[in-house]
């Protein structure tokens, strides 16, 4: 049995996790960084278009931009679901965060004067997104990873965290399975940070990497003490490349690309008269699905799609600013975007809900646990995230989370008195694995996970109704019961993908149920949560955040609610000139 002892353990080595590890180290903590994959393979690597910050570098296109404008657009974009104290903190910090990443070596695009160049993005009226062509996440992650290596932080990868260690209401570390050997390892920590990314793979059509399965959310939820916030707030990105669902960045439309239907008509102005192709993502995704429902999509073997047209931008602009988009479309769809339109359809993209934390990234309900990035709900994005705010969120949350966790760790005692709790959790997880190994394989975890993902896509998608959600919940509950009968054909614990999936799948269904149950109970439409049977926003009854708690003896979560923090901007019109989608009872 291996037991490691650190001041701070960070689970997840994407941008949020690496930035948290760097800041904890700066504050004097002994830090371990644990990852499923080699850090530079983390999903942050896939972020393309840019990072929002009010630098005002673009002359008339960004004139007068400051944190207040960034704050305003973020709150409006969230459909007043974000905590405004968090939004204020992040938008004020954004220029400093970006300049620090520039200092660390991020190769941002430059203006003729040598300033960091910024591009237009959806849901704003100024050019605010700093970018490195269309591989911004890749560039930022490499810069952060260099800092991690320079700091000498201990990195453990090919490690899957399967549970938290609790002593009463205090998190004292986590149990990790070494995916190469199958050994269980205890990482003890005075402060434990979860930065495990989103849960996109609970959907069958997602831009997310296959590692984005909600691991951090499920192990926090499984404590029964930590709530998941606003899990019904799921973002669908307008331009997933059909039919492989790889992201084509919003920067395509920020740089002048347009969406067209089967007749070649640029339809977005029919739905969002003020912003057109650069309305917020929830508006654009609903508009695209409305076009498809109206029969103006193109039929294909994997369902209907629409067109993203970049052909008028020219080869020089595409190859200098959208090179990855060009290569992705060529390699995965056989499309040359210089001369051909790319087939696209809205697809799951971002988990706006997550582990509920306070403004300093401390998880609600327990001591010693923190969360940052897409797995957290602190709550920067509310019910719709603006493009470019995710990279900012990961870095800002990582900074504050790492600092808070390190400072708190100084005031906590060593783990020597917690050995009984550590041994108890190790024994529990060993028993769980032994049960899977000894059980007859009546059910297959991978097949059940695939069924779950199809249910989520068809019943908890862009357009939602009470009847469809209820049907989806009933199907998910059936799967949750069946998952208890899963057994393994392969009995070796090391390098056993079947075991990895079997350990993860129950938590994935729990997260899916939190999404679906939150959606059926929220009888309004707000941001990305669109109820066709309740199509209007209801500030009188629903200007709040859903909190989902695990219940003993019930697979459905217990729901509670808390008020959203409003400091400067009271609820009002979002300013997109949105036209309501046509009414229909069809489910997506």
Protein language model regions, located:
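Glycine- and aromatic-enriched mobile tails/lids
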Residues: 1-6, 20-23, 27, 38-40, ...
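Glycine-rich Rossmann-fold phosphate-binding loop(s) that bind the pyrophosphate
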Residues: 12-15
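Short beta-strand "acidic-cap" motif of Rossmann-like dinucleotide-binding folds
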Residues: 30-35, 230
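Glycine-rich active-site loop/strand segments that organize a redox cofactor
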Residues: 53-90
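Short beta-strand to alpha-helix junction loop
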Residues: 82-92, 128-146, 156, 206-214, ...
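Conserved redox-cofactor binding core of oxidoreductases
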Residues: 97, 102-183, 188, 195, ...
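Glycine-rich loop(s) and the adjacent beta-strand/alpha-helix scaffold that form part
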Residues: 191-246, 278, 300, 387-404
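An anion/pyrophosphate-binding glycine-rich loop and adjacent beta-alpha core
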Residues: 219, 226-336, 343, 404, ...
């Amino acid at each position: 049995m291996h037991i490691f002892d650190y001041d701070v353990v960070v689970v997840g080595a994407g941008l949020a996790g690496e930035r948290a590890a760097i800041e904890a180290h700066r504050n004097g903590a002994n830090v371990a960084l644990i990852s499923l994959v080699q850090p530079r393979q983390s999903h942050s690597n896939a972020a393309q278009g840019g990072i929002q910050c009010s630098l005002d570098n673009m002359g008339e296109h960004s004139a007068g931009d400051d944190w207040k404008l960034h704050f305003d657009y973020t709150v409006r974009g969230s459909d007043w679901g974000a905590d405004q104290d968090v939004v204020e903190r992040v938008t004020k910090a954004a220029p400093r965060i970006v300049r620090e990443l520039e200092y660390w070596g991020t190769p941002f695009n430059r203006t003729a004067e040598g300033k960091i160049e910024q591009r237009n993005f959806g849901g704003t009226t100024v050019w605010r997104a700093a970018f490195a062509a269309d591989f911004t996440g890749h560039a930022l992650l490499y810069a952060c990873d260099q800092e991690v290596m320079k700091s000498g932080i201990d990195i453990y990868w090919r490690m899957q965290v399967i549970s938290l260690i609790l002593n009463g209401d205090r998190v004292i570390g986590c149990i990790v399975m070494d995916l190469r050997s199958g050994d269980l390892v205890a990482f003890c920590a005075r402060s434990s940070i979860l930065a495990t990314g989103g849960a996109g793979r609970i959907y069958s059509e997602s831009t997310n990497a296959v590692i984005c399965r909600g691991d951090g959310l499920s192990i926090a939820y499984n404590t029964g003490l930590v709530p998941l916030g606003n899990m019904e707030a799921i973002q669908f990105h307008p331009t997933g490349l059909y039919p492989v669902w790889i992201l084509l960045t919003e920067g395509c439309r920020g740089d002048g690309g347009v969406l067209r239907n089967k007749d070649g008509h640029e339809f977005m102005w029919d739905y969002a008269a003020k912003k057109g192709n650069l309305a917020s993502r929830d508006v654009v995704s609903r508009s695209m699905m409305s076009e498809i429902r109206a029969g103006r999509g193109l039929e294909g073997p994997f369902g209907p799609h629409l067109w993203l047209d970049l052909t008028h931008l020219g080869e020089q602009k595409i190859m200098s600013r959208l090179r990855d988009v060009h290569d992705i479309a060529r390699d995965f769809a056989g499309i040359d975007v210089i001369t051909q339109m790319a087939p696209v359809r809205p697809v799951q993209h971002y988990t706006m809900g997550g582990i509920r934390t306070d403004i300093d990234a401390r998880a609600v309900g327990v001591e010693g646990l923190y969360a940052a990035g897409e797995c957290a709900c602190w709550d920067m994005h509310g019910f719709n995230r603006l493009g470019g705010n995710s990279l900012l969120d990961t870095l800002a949350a990582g900074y504050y989370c790492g600092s808070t966790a390190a400072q708190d760790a100084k005031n906590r005692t060593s783990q020597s008195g917690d050995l009984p709790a550590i041994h108890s959790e190790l024994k529990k997880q060993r028993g769980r694995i032994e049960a899977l190994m000894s059980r007859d394989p009546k059910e297959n975890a991978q097949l059940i996970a695939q069924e779950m993902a199809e249910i989520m896509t068809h019943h908890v998608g862009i357009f939602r109704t009470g009847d469809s959600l209820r049907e989806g919940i009933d199907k998910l509950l059936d799967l949750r019961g069946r998952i208890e009968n899963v057994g393994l054909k392969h009995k070796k614990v090391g390098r056993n993908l079947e075991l990895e999936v079997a350990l993860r799948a129950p938590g994935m269904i729990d997260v899916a149920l939190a999404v679906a149950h939150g959606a059926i109970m929220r009888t309004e439409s707000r941001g990305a949560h669109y109820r066709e049977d309740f199509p209007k926003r209801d500030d009188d009854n629903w200007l709040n955040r859903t909190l989902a708690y695990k219940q003993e003896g019930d697979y459905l979560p217990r729901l509670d609610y808390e008020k959203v923090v409003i400091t400067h901007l009271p609820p009002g019109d979002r300013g997109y000139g949105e036209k309501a989608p046509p009414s229909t009872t069809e489910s997506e």
